[in-house]
Amino acid sequence: MTQWYPASPALWQGRDDSIEAPDARRLFQTVTRSETFSPENWQQKIALMGFACDEGVKRNAGRPGAAGAPDALRKALANMASHQGHERLVDLGNWVAPTPDLEGAQQALRDAVSRCLRAGMRTLVLGGGHETAFGHGAGVLDAFAQESVGIINLDAHLDLRQTDRATSGTPFRQLAQLCDAQSRAFHYACFGVSRAANTQALWREAQWRNVTVVEDLDCHDALAQMTQFIDKVDKIYLTIDLDVLPVWEMPAVSAPAALGVPLIQVLRLIEPVCRSGKLQAADLVEFNPRFDEDGAAARVAARLGWQIAHWWR
């Protein structure tokens, strides 16, 4: 059974510059850490949650280790300067999945996300493998059953695989099937896709599903496509698979990208999403601290989370 645990206070430590000025604060001083999972107490805040699971990566024949990412990313976030928006972050702990019950873990995350959103919070989830996306996305769909939900994925992979059980490569096929079951449209856009990393069958599935696909080669000029996608939906779920970044910026993932989309381009793409007023949920997935020798990759991932919270409107 998937268990919930509050985040350890030892994760939220950093340099104290408060002697310099009242506003010389860092995230460890402004993030609120909750000892209970009680989203109803935190309306209008951002629920920071960890999904400590990499069973989907294992099933997908990837490099395990992403289950350790949520706490590693908290440590990287803790010492970053606190600016506008960061005071809204409330750490609602980790959902820890026992091997091999991926399906139970996804259901627990789904229920937690739906509860947060219905309580008036927004969700920022630290994965975990990209199996995080089915639980997170399903929770968003549940919470906004009467509205159109757009799923924006920055990823080298389409993750539309067809297998006999859920993996880190199946979440968007699962979400498409959930939309079919709920008789609602499946709005999915994937930016940063590597043609070299996706079979013709996956491209055919994306075409059949009317997925908006922007390749890694074209992301430098993709803002218009991002804006068009934002405009056609009511609510947005943003998911960032860190393997969208080039290996020289992000080596600490299951499948590092030979080409990838540089961090600065990723930030330019997600800024209008964050500022749109439609973003309800976001996550960072596939970070693997086992392959982060000096903590540099954790800081790259944390900068994305930092920026999302700062820009979120």
Swiss-Prot record:
Cofactor note: Binds 2 manganese ions per subunit.
A biological process term (GO) from this entry: L-histidine catabolic process to glutamate and formate
Binding site for Mn(2+) 1: H130, D155, D159, D241
Pfam families: Arginase (PF00491)
Record carries keyword Manganese: yes
Residues bound to Mn(2+) 2: D155, H157, D241, D243
Keywords: Histidine metabolism, Hydrolase, Manganese, Metal-binding
Catalytic activity annotation: N-formimidoyl-L-glutamate + H2O = formamide + L-glutamate
Keyword NAD: no
Cofactor(s) listed: Mn(2+)
InterPro entries linked: HutG, Ureohydrolase, Ureohydrolase_dom_sf
Molecular function GO labels: agmatinase activity; formimidoylglutamase activity; manganese ion binding
UniProt-listed Enzyme Commission number(s): 3.5.3.8
This protein's pathway: Amino-acid degradation; L-histidine degradation into L-glutamate; L-glutamate from N-formimidoyl-L-glutamate (hydrolase route): step 1/1
Similarity comment: family membership: Belongs to the arginase family.
Function: Catalyzes the conversion of N-formimidoyl-L-glutamate to L-glutamate and formamide.
Name of the protein in its database record: Formimidoylglutamase
Gene expressing this chain: hutG
